[in-house]
Amino acid sequence: MKSQSEFESEMYFIKKKIILTIAFVISLLPMLLNQYGGMKGVQEISGLINLYNPIGIISVLFFIIGVWIPFKNKKINKVFGGLGVVGIVISEIYNFFTWHIMNITGKMSIHNSIEFAFPEFYVGLVISLIMIAVYFCIDKIVKE
């Protein structure tokens, strides 16, 4: 039978995992919006392309592994989860610079990247950056 302190410690970790998972899902919600395109209503591309590329898929898997799969060394969990949240931002930035090359322009251009990104992209990017801060500060946010 577990002691009271072991039970409280276990409940703290479960609470932390649930909060991190909810925050992560919320940080992905802007990807449901149209983030890229030539003109609203004419050519719109969902932010889900950020998750459909290999970086996005691996990042989500790393986050899930880091938060929900217990390792003996807790630093491994922190590294996997951290790679997951940082990887989402990398995926967003990668798509920001490259999505229009095959579809519209045929070349990489910061000007085109800025011109063809809707405000929803920037909102999603800021929320993803906030998620990184939440992930690395969760121990200060959620007290035992």
Residue map of PLM features:
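Cytosolic juxtamembrane helix and N-cap/initiation of the first transmembrane helix
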Residues: 1-33, 137-144
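Alpha-helical membrane-associated segments of multi-pass integral membrane proteins
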Residues: 16-20, 107-142
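Juxtamembrane transmembrane-helix termini
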Residues: 33-43, 69-75, 97-104, 134-144
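Interfacial non-cytosolic loop connecting adjacent transmembrane helices
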Residues: 37-52, 93-123
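Hydrophobic alpha-helical transmembrane segments
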Residues: 53-67, 125-130
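Membrane-interface helix-boundary signature
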Residues: 9-20, 48-52, 73-80, 114-124
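Hydrophobic transmembrane helix segments
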Residues: 16-60, 95
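Loop-to-transmembrane helix junctions at the membrane interface
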Residues: 66-99
